[in-house]
């Protein structure tokens, strides 16, 4: 089904070209979102100093913990909307849209309140050094005031992705990203507002992107048109969104808790190592966006084809996504490894900080294709409506391995290099478990659909 030039027909025609057409804007959108934070880091690091850089970086894991639960729930909205849209269920599609946008607004307000009230407590819990904690608290509190806008954009974009439209969300992020860059330069360099200026620039850019995506839904003439008078929670659709979204959100949140533990281990090396990890982690994030784009493509394509019972096409979606993910991540990972020092110099001129950043990149870039495979299998399962078991396996494989590594092995081998070997080890173990799970679920789904069609 295709209603306008922005949408992609996921259920008919060749696959690889459509996956690329869908994934590329999604990948660029993710990179632009990362650039919001990257601009903060670069401008603050260059014009305010390494302590301010460490302050901004120390909030990243915590921000991800707070946000990823609710962003994970938006995946449930994406899966449900894709299924209803492909099968032509217009009433159900409309109810899903209005429930999702209402949920986004409520989630954003809750997160804003929690972030403002709990910032200092959470940062102290992570062992943030005294020389940066005040700036970290200030940045985090201001940043979280923009959470309602952040959530509205993400849920609105999830609806557009469900119908095959990834181009307009990209356009919206180009506009808001340019605004963010200009505001950061003005507020930090001209008005000397430090970390506060970086956070304010991000809030304004998120406000703009949320207005644009809501306007897009409001002016649509399709089943996903937004009527503000219809906003509200419909329990039956909320349950279905939660069925897929909550396990995905919990998985993402718990994995980020393990990253917060890892951040605490990095903090024990001091502010120089923290700054190096901050810069390297930002580069690392660009790799993740390539993985995440292909994973979300796999989930959306699988969900639409599941809605119209095209089982063979679902299998082909996973295979083509696997080829695409491995190719992209190997290329980008090798590039990040070989050009690591040059990339880190964009963020800071401090030689010690660059050295620490290179140490982190050495064990996380080239093997990153394993992370892509690890994420694709649960993505395909969520597209079929199965989210609980992949969550449990990901937590055991990823989080369990890192906890054992940090508390069991790391104390006897204290170095950044040894700390970050835990990443590829956890990816490989999780792939093995997810592959077994996928085979069982795929067999069950095929049997169930074939019975329905008989």
Tell where the protein language model's regions lie, with residue ranges.
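Short alpha-helical transmembrane segments in multi-pass integral membrane proteins
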Residues: 1-23, 81-146, 190-246, 302-367, ...
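Residue-level signal for short hydrophobic patches within transmembrane helices
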Residues: 12, 16-35, 39, 62-69, ...
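Transmembrane helical elements of multi-pass membrane transporters/channels
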Residues: 21-40, 142, 176, 205-209, ...
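Hydrophobic alpha-helical transmembrane segments in multi-pass membrane proteins
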Residues: 22, 26-34, 71, 103-112, ...
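Helix-terminus/linker motif at the lipid-water interface of multi-pass membrane proteins
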Residues: 35-54, 123-130, 186-193, 253-286, ...
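Small-residue-rich hydrophobic transmembrane alpha-helices
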Residues: 53-113, 150-169, 276-334, 338-340, ...
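Hydrophobic transmembrane alpha-helices of multi-pass small-molecule transporters
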Residues: 65-68, 180-184, 210-214, 286-289, ...
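Short runs within selected transmembrane alpha-helices of multi-pass transporters and secretion channels
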Residues: 74, 143-161, 169-180, 198-211, ...
């Amino acid at each position: 089904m295709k209603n306008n030039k922005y949408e992609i027909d996921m259920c008919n025609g060749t696959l690889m070209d459509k996956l690329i057409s869908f994934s590329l804007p999604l990948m660029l959108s993710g990179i632009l979102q990362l650039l919001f934070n990257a601009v903060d880091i670069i401008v603050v690091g260059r014009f305010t100093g390494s302590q301010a850089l460490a302050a901004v970086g120390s909030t990243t894991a915590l921000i991800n913990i707070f946000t990823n639960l609710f962003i994970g729930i938006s995946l449930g909205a994406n899966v449900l909307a894709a299924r209803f849209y492909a099968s032509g269920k217009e009433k159900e599609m409309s109810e899903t849209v209005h429930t999702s946008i209402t949920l986004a607004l409520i989630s954003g307000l809750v997160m804003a309140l929690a972030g403002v009230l709990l910032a200092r407590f959470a940062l102290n819990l992570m062992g943030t050094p005294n020389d940066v904690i005040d700036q970290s608290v200030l940045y985090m509190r201001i940043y979280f005031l923009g959470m309602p806008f952040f959530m509205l954009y993400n849920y609105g974009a999830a609806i557009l992705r469900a119908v095959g439209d990834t181009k307009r969300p990209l356009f919206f992020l180009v506009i808001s990203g340019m605004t963010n860059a200009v505001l950061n330069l003005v507020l930090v360099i001209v008005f000397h507002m430090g970390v506060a200026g970086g956070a304010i620039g991000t809030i304004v850019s998120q406000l703009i992107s949320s207005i644009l995506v809501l306007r897009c839904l409001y002016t649509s003439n399709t089943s996903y048109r937004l009527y503000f008078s219809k906003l509200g929670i419909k329990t039956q659709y909320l349950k279905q969104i939660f069925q897929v979204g909550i396990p995905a959100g919990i998985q993402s949140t718990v994995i980020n808790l393990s990253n917060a533990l890892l951040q605490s281990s990095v903090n024990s090396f001091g502010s120089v190592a923290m700054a190096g990890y901050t810069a390297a982690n930002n580069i690392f994030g660009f790799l993740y966006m390539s993985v995440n784009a292909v994973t979300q493509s796999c989930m959306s394509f699988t969900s639409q084809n599941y809605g119209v019972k095209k089982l063979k096409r679902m299998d082909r979606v996973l295979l083509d996504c696997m080829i695409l993910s491995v190719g992209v991540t190997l290329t980008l990972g090798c590039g990040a490894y070989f050009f690591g020092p040059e990339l880190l110099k964009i963020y800071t001129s401090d030689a010690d900080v660059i050295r620490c950043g290179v140490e982190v990149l050495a064990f996380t870039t080239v093997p990153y294709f394993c992370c892509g495979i690890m994420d694709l299998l649960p993505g395909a399962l969520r597209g079929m409506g199965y989210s609980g078991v992949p969550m449990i396996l990901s937590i055991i494989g990823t989080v369990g391995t890192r906890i054992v590594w940090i508390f069991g092995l790391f104390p006897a081998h204290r170095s950044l290099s040894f700390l970050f070997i835990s990443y590829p080890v956890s990816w490989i173990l999780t792939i093995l478990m997810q592959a077994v799970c996928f085979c069982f679920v795929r067999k069950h789904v095929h049997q169930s659909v074939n019975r329905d069609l008989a």
